[in-house]
């Protein structure tokens, strides 16, 4: 939150992300984009319309991806990362998603949800900041997997024979 450059974008998105919900409209996030544009223009926040519109339109996507898809699957990450024209928008969406979910009631926000959301955020952030595309994401994912496997082998080799640990890890 502290690193967000324009907090007014986040505040506007928090206030407007469900603006079309009371109308009982299916796909309230789509209708909400038009409604938020009108409101922001009236408030003289023309320069925030595109970013707030993006956040309103996508405010359900991060939680749906984090909780219903495999955040370790490169295809999931490619699809999710492709939505973001700029890495900064991921930062805003992450905070908006957290605020939206944690505001519902105490039972909705769990450690598991927190972990899944953070995992999706971190993996996607790396992709966006490194400007990875297509097979570069696959290569990066494979490289990270190898690094993790190597660190597990190193840690377990302190108490077990290294060859046995490597054989087990490589067989997974």
Label for each model-derived stretch:
Residues 13-19, 23, 59-60, 96-102, ...:
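Generic structural signal for hydrophobic core residues of well-folded globular domains
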Residues 41-98:
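Acidic/histidine-rich catalytic neighborhood
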Residues 20-23, 30-32, 42, 61-65, ...:
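Flexible loop/turn segments at secondary-structure boundaries
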Residues 75, 79-172:
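Regulatory modules associated with amino-acid/nitrogen control
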Residues 10-17, 30-34, 38, 50, ...:
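Feature representing long, continuous alpha-helical segments
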Residues 1-28, 38-47:
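Acidic/His-rich, divalent-metal-binding segments that scaffold phosphate/diphosphate chemistry
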Residues 28-31, 69-74, 110-114:
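Short secondary-structure boundary/capping segments
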Residues 22-30, 47, 51, 56, ...:
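A glycine- and charged-residue-rich anion-binding loop/surface
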């Amino acid at each position: 939150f502290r690193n967000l450059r324009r907090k007014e974008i986040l505040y506007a998105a928090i206030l407007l992300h469900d603006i079309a919900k009371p109308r009982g409209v299916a796909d309230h996030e789509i209708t909400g984009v038009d409604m938020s544009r009108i409101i922001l223009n009236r408030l003289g926040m023309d320069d925030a319309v595109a970013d707030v519109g993006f956040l309103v339109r996508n405010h359900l996507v991060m939680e749906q991806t984090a909780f219903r898809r495999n955040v370790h699957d490169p295809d999931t990450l490619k699809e999710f990362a492709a939505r973001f024209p700029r890495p900064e928008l991921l930062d805003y969406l992450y905070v908006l998603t957290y605020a939206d979910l944690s505001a519902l009631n105490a039972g909705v926000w769990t450690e598991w949800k927190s972990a899944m959301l953070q995992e999706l955020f971190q993996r996607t952030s790396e992709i966006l900041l490194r400007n990875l595309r297509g097979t570069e994401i696959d290569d990066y994912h494979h490289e990270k997997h190898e690094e993790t496997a190597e660190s597990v082998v190193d840690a377990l080799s302190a108490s077990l024979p290294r060859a046995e640990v490597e054989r087990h890890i490589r067989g997974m």
